[in-house]
């Protein structure tokens, strides 16, 4: 009897797939569009740490679906590549003195080795790397299309600059401290510095970016996050005349009905009117206040938890309707980049205004109430209601009626207009860094922009030794004079020395996969029409806003220019849940690294002081040393075991804790299949009850794969394998279809079983997904409840009259039960035939 030698089997089939290019995409144009599917993973950034077990979760899900579709005769596009430009590689290069290109390419080789070890069905001939010159040539080309369409422009804007590091920092690299902002790296002082930056006019697409979310099958949470990020508000822009001046201040509000309760205006410290209206005697103190506030991040200034600060300018504005004089303040919580950079403050009906008014003893006038009568305000009334304390024609009306009348009055008197506002800002698209795509623009002596011609692309990143920051806030490229200075028609021009952000390459990579070796265009139009849109896109929820929003923006521009055929790039989106790990906490709530923890008598203790620790679920991190390396898992249990375990842990979209005990159960499951393979293979007709169970299994697994419920599909397979083990013979008419439906989950074992049955080529080239026959199904299943201490943790379907021992095994192999009894003492197990298993534990 042979042993399940997973190492030998997995190596054998990985070599076979590579040699025969088993997963090379079919380019036959005669394959109809309805029989094609584009399945895509969010491609990884190749960090020096390599993969941990969380990465393959999404990759395994797409791989199962890919193999299932191949077995159903589909033409499947399932590529992989690397998001290889970006800040982490450059920072690591600066720290180590190694070139970012060498670091990146070494990391990619490690990633590929790990990915291939898991047996994923990628067409590696389509691999892309965003730092590859043949790729970023087309990133530059797309930038030029944006530029020609008027969607790319330069502007001087304030950025974080660190004099000690000699470089500009991203918001994420700056820490706010009581002593002011500091760099995350080195804890150096940072300052706001105006620098010329490239921006992309994503704001031009704000409305479409909201509207077209209705056309995609995405999680509601992601749609809501994008809508909130774009931040659409419908309201009125109102003009307030400044007393003793012809100047006006424009404010935007969604509640024009509250204009009667305005008791002051607040301007952003950076508002252009501040210097014009401030009284001379107040200018020194206001200048000092401005300098302090603009050093803060937008998040810090607008945080509800932060104290609101402000200062009076000495100037007054006139309420356009009531003609009341109202003081003009500047306040930290108003941003110059949102709306008009000024607000009309109605403290009776806005939380921030209420807090500010209380702090500075400003009037609070109620003009809306729930009942239509004056009330004592302990907190602002922010709901709709009945107007009070307003001119007669506006008084005692519902909010919606007052809004309508106020808007009409403002428009008729040319003091306001209806307007839609968005929180979304234009995308800052330049970085003062080396490791990114060079921007294909030249400047003359007058800083006029000259875009490169298409035949001048790619503008290659010079291979330099000194890629450290320039020390002036400029990119390291600014130091390469023979690269920066370009002679044209006898004149000297200067290249743009900023580079593109990491997001650039990931904005369009899904298109390049369609035609990765095309040297004439970014992708062939026929191939775009054939494959797009991406049918299923799987990746982490952390990309819900930036990557997905930027990719949608670029896609819409390409759609408007006629280069792509769909309004949206990704038809269906799934966010896989996070795979977490155990961590350990002391009595003060401090997390202790795993290598400082020891287990004694099912309890956990600190190695340093022998104090007992609490086991909790936490995100995998280097500092906690609770990262699980897939290489170790594959070495001990095999890739097929790891793949199945990650899918069996729970629903794809749920967060789940890693537990090696569950993995051992999966390994045993695969060994059971091998035991069946070792039985006498026969062409005899199987008993009716086995045929019935087979068709039930095919039906359930088919339905579960289609709906991405992989955990229940695996559970169904386990139940059927346990049933087959009871029989002395291995029936070919059963083993053949069961090997096929197993193969998407355990492709190496599936191939081995296929070959064992006498087949010569890959199961994914030669097999067809079995069809179930409803007439063959005998309904003898029962739903049972799995409980811990009397509380239901799961419900599963089992065969009627399942014996007590099998029930117990099913319960103890159930992932939800494992999670709830982990490190607990089992007191007793209660089973009720065909109804429940209750595990009593403490």
From Swiss-Prot:
Protein name: Leucine--tRNA ligase
GO cellular component assignments: cytosol
E.C. code: 6.1.1.4
GO molecular function, one term: ATP binding
Residue numbers covered by motif 'KMSKS' region: 619-623
Stored NCBIfam families: leuS_bact
Natural source organism: Borrelia duttonii (strain Ly)
Sequence motif 'HIGH' region, location on chain: 44-55
Top-level enzyme category: ligase
InterPro entries linked: aa-tRNA-synth_I_CS (IPR001412), aa-tRNA-synth_Ia (IPR002300), Leu-tRNA-ligase (IPR002302), Leu_tRNA-synth_edit (IPR025709), M/V/L/I-tRNA-synth_anticd-bd (IPR013155), Methionyl/Leucyl_tRNA_Synth (IPR015413), Rossmann-like_a/b/a_fold (IPR014729), tRNAsynth_Ia_anticodon-bd (IPR009080)
